[in-house]
């Protein structure tokens, strides 16, 4: 399968064998070739560019505290893995392309764009820094067909308290039945996806990073499972063409906590071990 737009990612130097994934290590990022993605950290220190050269991140030591690189901010709960964004940009964009993140959080996407020479555009209901514009992803303040790529990591129902803004989609419960007077999580996300389709240029791509969700609930045997990934994928397919589905391994310290594992075993439910990355194209 040819790379989109004749992407120049053809390293002059051989990539060699895939580095072993070891907890705590941060090997330079390289473009991954399978639909199972794994990296031992949320953030990267360096990456291999289009010429096969190892390039250090411009954000080394800025917020990490230990001298390692940190794209976005370490204190932001629910931050996107910067290495996943890097993989998307290296495959589906070129230098100088515009990249939109309509739920920009702590600005991770903008930092990755800076590293690889893309023009980052970020909106958020509660901006955390000056280069993120205030805005609702359900009404993106951009012209039609104006951006080259969109990355979005939306709330997975109510699992994280992102802000005090009552409009926040993270306050909408994906497990409840829709009500006439209250916007439902899936209705809100359908509006977001419609806006992404509107602002994305034809023949360009988007990536949506999301997880299903599970919540224990009194009176419900086995708790409540929310197949958020499947629901959002179905919404996107109504407007765009599916390119692929990536399974991203989650390296979350909470998954290794004995009490969490014990609760999952005794309660007969599963801890979330992976996220989806849905890749779509606007035809």
Predicted segment positions?
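Class I S-adenosyl-L-methionine-dependent methyltransferase catalytic core
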Residues: 1-283
């Amino acid at each position: 399968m040819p790379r989109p737009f004749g992407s120049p990612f053809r390293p002059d130097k051989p990539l060699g064998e895939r580095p072993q994934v070891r907890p705590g290590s941060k090997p330079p990022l390289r473009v991954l070739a399978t639909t199972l993605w794994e990296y031992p950290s949320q953030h990267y220190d360096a990456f291999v560019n289009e010429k096969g050269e190892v390039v250090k991140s411009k954000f080394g030591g800025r917020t990490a505290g230990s001298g390692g690189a940190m794209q976005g901010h370490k204190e932001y709960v629910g931050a996107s893995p910067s290495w996943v964004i890097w993989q998307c940009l290296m495959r589906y964009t070129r230098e100088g392309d515009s990249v939109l993140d309509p739920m920009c959080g702590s600005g991770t996407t903008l930092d990755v764009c800076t590293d690889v020479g893309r023009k980052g555009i970020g909106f958020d209901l509660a901006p955390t820094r000056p280069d993120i514009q205030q805005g609702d992803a359900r009404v993106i303040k951009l012209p039609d067909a104006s951006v080259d790529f969109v990355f979005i990591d939306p709330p997975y129902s109510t699992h994280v308290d992102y802000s005090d803004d009552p409009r926040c989609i993270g306050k909408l419960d994906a497990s409840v039945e829709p009500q006439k007077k209250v916007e439902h999580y899936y209705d809100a996300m359908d509006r977001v996806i419609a806006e992404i389709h509107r602002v994305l240029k034809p023949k360009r791509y988007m990536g949506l990073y999301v997880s299903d969700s599970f919540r224990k609930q009194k009176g419900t045997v086995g708790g409540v499972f929310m197949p958020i990934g499947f629901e959002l994928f179905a919404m996107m397919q109504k407007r765009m063409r599916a390119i692929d589905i990536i399974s991203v391994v989650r390296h979350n310290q909470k998954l290794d906590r004995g009490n969490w594992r014990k609760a999952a075993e005794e309660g007969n439910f599963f801890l979330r071990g992976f996220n989806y990355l849905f890749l779509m194209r606007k035809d």
